[in-house]
């Protein structure tokens, strides 16, 4: 079951509210799950992204601010190397995390010959920004024991992670994704 807490939503890689005094919009895991079923059709850098924290103040994209104020509700990982299949990733996550809820989807740069994955795995209880970075490191080490390499940048408390998206150049003439799994 996907709970209803609201995570930081970033509208494209240039979206910054640091000097605006405004808070970032938010998104729920249920909304992300719906997006995984019908991914966005945007150029990668214009696509929405998330930070797995509920701290959405104007400085939410700062690692220091998220470490200090962040309340994190999910692991987020990127698997960009190693030709890992969706089945292999799900088996490894089940071995490590048990029968847990998760959203796993192909990234915007994935192809059938070079699959790449993003996974969002909710916690039972929220953790601080410092705890989040430590837990991310532990999960990545556990996945490495299953021969799955995670993008180490995702350990950062304010690291944004793109949401489900298949850009126009990765779609056929009919608009359907050339490759997308979730």
Predicted regions and their residues:
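Signature for HUH/AEP ssDNA processing cores
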Residues: 1-115, 121-134, 138
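Generic secondary-structure boundary/loop-capping signal
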Residues: 47, 52, 120, 151, ...
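Generic structural signal for short, solvent-exposed loop/turn connectors between secondary structure elements
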Residues: 83-85, 171, 182
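Secondary-structure boundary/capping signal
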Residues: 100-102, 147-150
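Short, conserved secondary-structure transition motifs
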Residues: 110-112, 127, 149-180
